[in-house]
Curated annotation (Swiss-Prot):
Belongs to the AATF family. GO terms for cellular component: nucleolus. It comes from Aspergillus fumigatus (strain ATCC MYA-4609 / CBS 101355 / FGSC A1100 / Af293) (Neosartorya fumigata). InterPro entries: AATF, AATF/Bfr2, AATF_C. This is Protein bfr2. The gene is bfr2. It comes from the Eukaryota. Residues 1-225, 404-430, 537-565 are annotated as: Disordered. It is found in: Nucleus, Nucleolus. Keywords: Nucleus. Residues 1-31, 125-154, 207-225 have a biased composition (Basic and acidic residues).
Amino acid sequence: MAPKTLAERLAELEDPTPKDFDPEDLERAGPDSDDEGNEAADPNAGREHYQAVGKARLRRQDPINLGKQYAGSKISREALEAESDDDPFRPRSSDEEEDSEDEEEEDSELGSDEDEDASEESEEERPQRSRTSAKDSKRQRKESQVSSDEKDGEGMDTDGSEETEGSEDDSEDGFDEDDMSGEFSSDDDQEGDEDGDDDEDEDEETDNRKVRFQETSKSDDREELRRLMSSDQKTIAATISQAAKADAAKGRAVKQQRATFDALLNARIKLQKGLTAINRLSVTTKGSDETPSIDGEAIKSAESAALALWSTLEDLRLALADAQTQDESKKRKRPSAVSVATSTDSLWKRMTDLESDAVPHRRTVLDKWSLKVRGSTAALPNARGKLLGASASSQQTISAVIDAQVASETGDRAAKRRRHSSDEGPEPVYDDTVFYQSLLRDLVEQRMSSSDAITNGIDTLHLQLPSRQGIHPITGMRKDKVKRDVDTRASKGRKMRFDVHEKLQNFMAPEDRGTWTITAREEFFASLLGKTASGLLREGDDEDASAAEESDEDREEVGLRLFRS
């Protein structure tokens, strides 16, 4: 293409219209200009002899892969403008504003001309022909209006726009013809007036239909949004309420379990004094000739109380067994009530039968809850390269641990009795000191942790109850050898030994705010003790004199020490 001439360049400079370039037009690389001065400068100018080297990794701007959900879609300008036309809040352009102003001016001019024509004419000069033509035009417009109502929203818009344009064209044509010819007939003026009124009414009706259609569509969208939001809120509230109900049920179950455990522990604590008293009872041997004094009434009352307690415990165990069994046919029948005449062997047999039936269920429940409560421990290698988590003690069930604990306790007590007793047989005593102490320790620790009351009670707790250092933390069994924690570096003065004392709390030095002096206090107490002030002062003078004499003697003795060998 030939370069531009000077005249063309001057015309471009004098043209005040700014050049508009579409930024979304990807096919165009830039503004079409053949001017050499507007061309971009070559960045490699003067560097042709350099070796071509790519950008460094830090200077290279690699695109960030955000994923498919962040990828946009390309649309045309027409689709974008079509979407923006539907927006009632979009900004209006200058062309649209000018068109609306022109239409308003034309409508005002037509209305003024029609008013002048109508005032000049009289009703007598209007012929019958204008009336018939007006009626025909009204009838045609009503038919077109009915047909436009049956169509959808888009049809309404197009028909209304065509009718308004047609009416405007007709009015403009009529106005021009009247100006050119200069002849204004009364019939044409009347018809033009009626046509203008009908066109305005139709325009208003079409505008009202559009507004109503837009309002109904917006209201439907809002109702749909409200319905979706309400359904989402109901779903979220239902899930939250279900989770809260489940947590509340778990909390109530745990609270009930703790209350049951506390009640059983309270009963065991109350039985401790009775068990201690029973173990102190003397046991008479079969070959002894001693006949202790027997109180028949006390024995009968104790026997009846023991049988009542035994009956209550048996009823409780039978109720628990029936609750565990769902089948009615497998439920145990209630035996006859015990009495004083019932033999001890029958009582023992009934107890062993109940125990044998309850043992499997008890062991199953204990193992299940022990596995749930026991946390998962990581397998860590020890000094020998073995895994600590793979030990046999961690794989044992709680029922096996309890059996081993009971067996060890029974064996230890039997060995102690054999060492301390004579040739006589073992005394039938009930001894669960270790278990009872563990229960007490758990109870005290729970109370101490729940209430931040007294910290000094922990020290008294360790003094009163035996420590748990000799019990294995997993199996619960006592260790044979307890390794003492001894600091090997503390010998030979390599480590300073000290005791850390607690800080003094709420300490405040005494402050004397009294009005009495020390002399007044001494006189007051001297009068209470029957001494006079003069005697008290005389005693003070004697003490001062003796102290002065002693100080003089000390000085002389110190001076003589210099000459001692």
